[in-house]
Amino acid sequence: MSEDVRLVAWVRGQVQGVGFRWFTRARALELGGMSGFALNLGDGRVQVVAEGPRERCEGLLEWLRGDDTPGRVDGVTEIWDTPRGGYEGFAIR
């Protein structure tokens, strides 16, 4: 079993107003074992915070960078950290 981690990703491109946060939540729930949120930022990016097993978070990051996301992703910047907890489920903020 892999260690639990915290993934914080900032997704840029045409990612607001296209259902991106909803689909991100759906993908996180489909992968399972993660908690966190997806949030629209004022500069047009979407911030995704996910905590859970490393392989699940890596799967979510791979999806964020893939061609199956709604809208258009121009790039994803991520940082990895230790989990902080405090999330229940995966929310859209």
UniProtKB/Swiss-Prot annotation:
Keyword Hydrolase among UniProt keywords: yes
Keywords: Hydrolase
Pfam family, one: Acylphosphatase
Residue ranges of every copy of the Acylphosphatase-like domain listed in the record: 6-93
An example Gene Ontology molecular-function term: acylphosphatase activity
Entry EC no(s): 3.6.1.7
Swiss-Prot/TrEMBL catalytic activity: an acyl phosphate + H2O = a carboxylate + phosphate + H(+)
InterPro entries in the cross-refs: Acylphosphatase (IPR020456), Acylphosphatase-like_dom (IPR001792), Acylphosphatase-like_dom_sf (IPR036046), Acylphosphatase_CS (IPR017968)
Residues at the active site: 21, 40
Family listed: Belongs to the acylphosphatase family.
Record PANTHER family: ACYLPHOSPHATASE
Name this protein carries in UniProt: Acylphosphatase
Record organism: Streptomyces coelicolor (strain ATCC BAA-471 / A3(2) / M145)
The encoding gene: acyP
